[in-house]
Amino acid sequence: MMNEALKKLEELLDKDQFEKIKAINNPYLHSFLAEWIQWLEPSKVYVCTDSEEDEEYVRWKALYYGEERMLEMVRHTVHYDNYYDQARDKQNTKLLVPKGTNLPFLNTMDREDGLREIREIMKGIMRGKELFIGFFVLGPKNSVFTIPAVQLTDSAYVMHSEFLLYRKGYEEFKRLGPTKNFLKFVHSAGELDERKTSKNLDKRRIYIDLVDETVYSANTQYGGNVIGLKKLAFRLTIQRAVREGWLSEHMFLMRVNGPNGRKTYFTGAYPSMCGKTSTAMIPWENIVGDDLVFIKNLDGVARAVNVEIGVFGIIEGINQKDDPIIWQVLHSPVEIIFSNVLVKDGKPYWNGMGIEIPDEGENHSGKWWRGKRDAEGKEIPPSHKNARFTVRLEAFPNLDREALENPCGVEVGGMIFGGRDPDTWPPVRESFNWDHGVITMGAALESETTAATLGKEGVRAFNPMSILDFLSVHIGDYLRNYLEFGRKLKKTPKIFAVNYFLRENGQWLNEKLDKAVWLKWMELRVHNDVGAIETPIGYIPRYEDLKVLFRQVLNKDYSREDYEKQFKIRVPELLAKIDRIWKIYEPIDNIPEELFQELEKERKRILEAREKYGDYISPFALEK
């Protein structure tokens, strides 16, 4: 017998589209779709299966509706967002929680109020528009990591982006049958202006219902606000991971190639502008993913998968010299959506690309010319600093394809936390153990704000595990889950911290590619192939080992003087950091006691070393 929701869907959909939904035996899905199709009132509905025809239909519709335009290179298109819709809207992104829920640092709203408001905004918002329904999975299909998700959107650009970024999941939904275990995303770009960008930005809302695992976004097109399975799903999967005892992390996943063909996998969490992409893209190593991972305990071993199969990357500053692989991908005839870049004669241009940029063209502000100013009198650059490219990982020659598709994931040899400061953390170090690494490296992560982030330059932004913007649970619960996850493993990944941004007298102490050496050292440490120097803050490399690696990896000399400058233990700065981190956590209830214990032990070790060696300690003094 057909359930009520299915009957309703039969009325609402064309026969072909209805048959696609009917083939999925899931009454929970049927009632969700029936409710929202009625509420949104689209004039047409298209259901995407896993077929190439459906993907082609979406590509065509993105062009037909004017949300994307073709560029000169085959398979390349450009999309523009509203001039004032160019980044994640933190103010209007809210977690909907039951009354009385307290989540420090997070932007929350009473669930009943939030649902009432978003429903009001979205009532009939798709009149005269086409609704696309897409099915996807996070993580590999048919695996212990798989999380199914359904996306409703009136933007062909959003659906096109998700086809590039995620594994298709229609067949997976059919296989799973009547499960409630799927994530739900409802998006409308709202009314569009003549450039086909969202018009009613005053009604822009991104509401994340943590109870029903559903995200609603309205009157916005910027990827971070609307690509449901990206950072919106991330908040839902963090909550799920903490509840179920695994990790959902804002990390790259890469393979570092060791001696004799050995493959070692690392995850890495770095706040923006801290070197995450450039680390994951070192030409002679291999990428598995650049942004989001799931890590689970399988038979006592931490194993990780890339949640995605594509890259939604910042294009600013990508140039041939520093980013040869990405540059090559962006100039090859693979399917790419460029967003908010300058276009002239069908070619895309962006800030910092290292070649001459035309003096006029079209960009996110419309018709553009050099010196053009916006309504606030600010000069408009050729491309927006948050301009993006969306492309499948299979386009990258350095992709580790086997690791990307392995349903069991890959063993995590090491986890890297990458901060940014001019004077505190050494370039690379290893923690004493899991708890020490989680607390003094991950939970204490800071990045000095740069010109590229809003706010004052030179301020240290606290960003534990680089996850603060996306956290959806109490930070104490999140950290407790992290600590417990490691304790349950038979084989614990090593934890490392890196900092590529040390300065002395205004000069950088490291060159851009030095990070390639730190990776090789970490790979050797995972397998205990080299020794290390014990310091109050963890293990650092020995000069002799780095000297060999600099010659092997970069074919250059590495002086004792450089080593000493980079790896000296900076006592006053390290103590100041412990005080800063302590003060942030101290007023918050429900923080694991281990956090304060680890910080106190670290402080004690640093003070003891100061007694013996003074404020600035040469690594040679500590070498036993």
UniProtKB/Swiss-Prot annotation:
Compartments in which it is found: Cytoplasm
Q: What is its EC number?
A: 4.1.1.32
One matching Pfam family is PEPCK_N
Which residues are the active-site ones?
A: 274
Catalytic activity reads: oxaloacetate + GTP = phosphoenolpyruvate + GDP + CO2
Q: Which residues bind GTP?
A: 273-278, 388, 420
- Any keyword GTP-binding? yes
Q: Please tell me where substrate binds in this chain.
A: 88, 222-224, 272, 386-388
Question: Superkingdom of the source?
Answer: Archaea
For this chain's record, the cofactor binding note is: Binds 1 Mn(2+) ion per subunit.
This protein's major location comes to cytoplasm
The family line of this record is: Belongs to the phosphoenolpyruvate carboxykinase [GTP] family.
HAMAP family under this entry?
A: PEPCK_GTP (MF_00452)
Supply the name of the protein.
Answer: Phosphoenolpyruvate carboxykinase [GTP]
Question: Which organism is the protein's source?
Answer: Pyrococcus furiosus (strain ATCC 43587 / DSM 3638 / JCM 8422 / Vc1)
- Give the organism's phylogenetic lineage: Archaea, Methanobacteriati, Methanobacteriota, Thermococci, Thermococcales
- Please state the gene responsible for encoding this protein: pckG
